């Protein structure tokens, strides 16, 4: 018991002394996760439409992209974006008044590309879960295909899609810790900074784990409210 109390005391001391480190890490983690899911949702929706397209080349292209992204490690994708693109002559954007913008851009692009593949399957599954009879009924009433999709299918599919998108956001937050390898000051990166200064690793990692848990718990708690709306 005494050892546990001492451990918790060291954790609290570390947290109060280096709370600005952890706060910056949380901020950057949420920024990366938010934009990754936002862009992933936008392009994932487009990819889902291509995946269900009647035009075979587009459908095959979307299927190949989704299978490739889901079948390769996120680390490889991140390294290719950050290190590989500049080697091919494609420079990442950089803004002088935003520190490390190119690193953030690489992290968000890689995370968005990865999320896009999973979101595409979430949306496709949500749409296909709607009974096909709904589509046939709408078409028999004279609805165009676009009207059928926007006015009949999507409103019903959203109920299937939103919970899965919430889970995707949770997954992106957890996977975003990988961007620390390219120098983005997310929560994991800042935790490593604290370890480098204090040489106290276990307590610091425990703090990081608790902070991740709190962030994800808040998202889970907010989901029922969002779905009711």
Task: Locate the predicted segments by residue.
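Conserved protein kinase catalytic core
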Residues: 229
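Transmembrane alpha-helices and adjacent helix-loop boundaries
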Residues: 1-222, 226
């Amino acid at each position: 018991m005494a050892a546990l109390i001492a451990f918790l005391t060291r954790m609290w001391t570390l947290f109060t002394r280096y709370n600005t480190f952890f706060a910056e890490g949380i901020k950057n983690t949420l920024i990366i996760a938010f934009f990754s899911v936002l862009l992933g949702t936008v392009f994932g929706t487009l990819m889902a439409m291509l995946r269900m397209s009647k035009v075979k080349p587009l459908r095959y292209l979307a299927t190949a992209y989704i299978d490739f992204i889901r079948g390769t490690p996120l680390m490889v994708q991140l390294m290719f974006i950050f290190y590989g693109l500049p080697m091919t002559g494609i420079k990442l954007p950089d803004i002088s008044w935003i520190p490390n913008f190119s690193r953030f851009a690489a992290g968000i692009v890689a995370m968005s590309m990865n999320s896009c593949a999973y979101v595409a399957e979430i949306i496709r599954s949500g749409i296909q879960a709607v009974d096909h009879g709904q589509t046939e009924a709408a078409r028999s009433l004279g609805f165009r295909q676009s009207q059928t999709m926007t006015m009949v299918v999507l409103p019903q599919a959203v109920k299937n899609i939103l919970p899965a998108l919430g889970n995707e956001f949770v997954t992106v937050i957890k996977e975003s810790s990988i961007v620390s390898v390219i120098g983005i000051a997310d929560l994991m990166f800042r935790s490593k900074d604290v370890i480098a200064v204090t040489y106290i690793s276990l307590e610091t990692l425990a703090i990081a784990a608790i902070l991740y848990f709190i962030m994800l718990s808040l998202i889970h708690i907010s989901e029922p409210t969002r779905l009711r709306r």
